[in-house]
Swiss-Prot record:
Subcellular location: Golgi apparatus; Membrane
Sequence similarity: Belongs to the major facilitator superfamily. CAR1 family.
Keyword Membrane belongs to the record: yes
Signal peptide: none
Stated name of the protein: Uncharacterized transporter SPAC750.02c
InterPro entries in the record: MFS, MFS_dom, MFS_trans_sf
Membrane topology: Multi-pass membrane protein
GO cellular component, one term: membrane
Main location: Golgi
Any single GO BP term: transmembrane transport
A Pfam family: MFS_1
Spans traversing the lipid bilayer: 79-99, 117-137, 139-159, 170-190, 199-219, 275-295, 313-333, 355-375, 380-400, 421-441, 448-468
Top-rank taxon, per record: Eukaryota
């Protein structure tokens, strides 16, 4: 490839190293991802985003077939819904393990190993002979598939300067978010066909295998300490004054101890950083609610509107359209407002400048979920609740994207572990909320059930104005010290 040849040329002819002095180069440095050609960066973003998309696609892939699976395995709908809960819990534990591991061994090997196992795990899921087998392999599928989700934010922080990062973060988080909305559209028709629900997972295997092929070809290492270590290993000894991170290698650590430390690190960061706690509560609540709606969505159309599974699956298009529409609205507006705040601040950007769009997003999500719930409750013409679900999807994107970018901007190269801490709480709520879907709407009906969810989100979202005004002071009072973790 042209970009790679440029980097190789620079590597061999332009870099001269004298121990204890900086490495000089007149062209893009293959060991500094921020200087790579834009096309090389975008290729990494596309591969990582595809991994994350398919991981999230797998989250709701069997939602339209819950009744079919329950019938085959002679189980209740709630027990089968555990397939979504355990998958999300697998993603949670994956974030605990894979994000810090990538900060020891690099991003690329973690991506490739984890995603290879994820693809292969679709085989035993499709061949499950009982519910226990189905649930166990769903958990491990979520665990190993989480490599894109747990390290994506960190990879983008590796690749782009803060001023250029916003639009790529929006693309990444949008692709991440539309996966659960697209999967049921396809699965809805599979569930009512004669080929069986198993093909929902065969299709996921095919898509994952195709993406894995391109990942092996195109994905590059981006984590700076790992690249710097390789750089100094090639051009000279590491001096005493070089960063400690460059002297650490995985060979010096016992695997068991490393995994234990890896699981502890994101939790420790989360609990010690007030801004992360606020962000985690807000993102966790809205993520749990969107997961709850996705699981209950097809049943709403079947019970209230007598739609077939295939047509009920098509209704997920409204959520997906809302997600896409928010990108074209939120991305330019949020970036312009961020640039305005930077200019007003004398050209210096602050992480808190990412937050204003989140205020709007939470408000829209609450409007959308109330409109969806009450119109479905009274069986108003089907187009009206789809408007509510579209607004809800847009509100989700407009809330989660700015908050995720806020975490990335605040923690830089340690954003993988910081984001993992937030995702732990987010995924925990995402795993728990769907379990309550059936009982919530049965006892309170769709109207009052959605009203309760809206009030919970309102309470959590009150932290955003506080963070916008006092976030910098809070960060200065509790500065992040990576050596403590």
């Amino acid at each position: 490839m042209k970009e790679e040849s440029i980097l190789k040329k620079c590597d061999s002819s332009s870099i001269k190293h004298v121990p204890s002095t900086p490495l000089e180069t007149n062209c893009p440095d293959k060991y500094n991802p921020k200087t790579w050609p834009i096309r090389l960066k975008v290729r990494n973003v596309i591969v990582i985003s595809s991994m994350t998309f398919l991981n999230q696609y797998g989250d709701s892939v069997f939602a339209p077939s819950i009744s079919n699976i329950a019938e085959q395995f002679h189980a209740s709908r709630t027990l089968v819904t555990l397939g979504a809960t355990l998958y999300t819990l697998g993603i949670l534990f994956g974030n605990l393990i894979f994000a810090p591991l990538s900060e020891q061994f690099g991003r690329r090997p973690i991506y490739l190993i984890g995603y290879s196992v994820f693809a292969l795990l679709q085989i035993p899921i499709a061949l499950s002979v009982n519910l226990a087998m189905f649930l166990v392999f769903r958990f491990f599928s979520g665990l190993f598939g989480s490599v894109g989700l747990s390290n994506g934010s960190g990879s983008l922080a590796d690749l782009f300067e803060k001023k250029d990062r916003g639009k790529y973060m929006v693309i990444y988080f949008t692709v991440l978010s539309i996966g659960p909305g697209i999967a049921p559209i396809i699965s809805g028709f599979i569930s009512q066909s004669s080929i069986g629900w198993q093909w929902e997972f065969w299709i996921l295997l095919i898509l994952s295998g195709f993406n894995l092929f391109w990942a092996f070809l195109l994905l590059k290492e981006t984590y700076p300490p790992v690249l710097n270590r390789k750089k100094f290993e090639k051009y000279g000894e590491i001096g005493e004054n070089e960063p400690v991170a460059l002297r650490l290698t995985g060979k010096q650590l016992l695997i068991k101890l490393l995994i234990l430390l890896s699981m502890k690190k994101p939790i420790s960061i989360l609990l010690s950083q007030p801004i992360l706690i606020c962000v985690a509560c807000t993102i966790g609540s809205i993520y749990g609610m969107i997961n709850l709606v996705l699981i209950a969505f097809s049943e709403v159309w079947k019970s209230s509107y007598d739609f077939s599974p295939g047509i009920s699956g098509l209704m997920y298009i409204s959520i997906t359209l809302g997600l896409f529409s928010a990108v074209f609205i939120a991305m330019p507006i949020n970036q312009k407002f961020y640039s305005y705040l930077v200019k007003r601040n004398g050209g210096e950007g602050e992480p808190e400048f990412r937050l204003p769009m989140g205020f709007i997003g939470i408000t829209l999500f609450e409007i959308g979920i109330l409109l969806f719930g009450w119109t479905a409750r009274y069986k108003i013409f089907w187009f009206v609740p789809t408007i509510g679900s579209a607004i809800m999807g847009g509100g989700y994107i407009m809330t989660s994207n700015p908050l995720n970018m806020y975490v990335v901007d605040s923690y830089g190269i340690y954003s993988a572990s910081a984001s993992a801490g937030v995702k732990i709480f987010q995924l925990l709520l995402g795993a728990i909320f769907p379990l309550f879907a059936e009982s919530l709407f049965r006892r309170l009906n769709y109207g009052w059930g959605c009203t309760l969810l809206a009030f919970i989100l309102l309470a959590c979202g009150c932290s955003l104005p506080i963070l916008f005004k006092y976030g910098k002071q809070i960060r200065n009072l509790r500065p992040f010290d990576p050596s403590k973790y």
